[in-house]
Amino acid sequence: MSGLKESRAKVLAWAKEHLLGKVMYEPQSGKEVVFTMKGIKEAINQPHAHYLEKLAAIPHIEDLFEESVYAGDSLDESRPDYVYRYYATTIANEVSFIVIRENLYTGLVDFYSIVDKIKE
């Protein structure tokens, strides 16, 4: 197994054991944020300028989120049932964003990804 595949597999296994189903509090909305398998996989697979550092940050996501700063939200025209909220954090000494997604129909708020730029 290559180093990258091995790193991804280790982070996924760790996240399944330690994050899946766990809840953290989002101060911007006052809602609970759930860690889902979809969000965990999205965070692991999402391209990033500092991909390995992003993978290394996932086990620390709760602390990073707690220290993050709200940076705005957006709607996706192709998915009007979701609003995405962005929280600025630092990975590899550069700004990255923790993405929290809220389903406007079901009310589910989940951790969705970590990105290096906000989608326009």
Sequence positions of predicted segments:
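Ribonuclease/tRNase effector modules and their secretory precursors
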Residues: 1-120
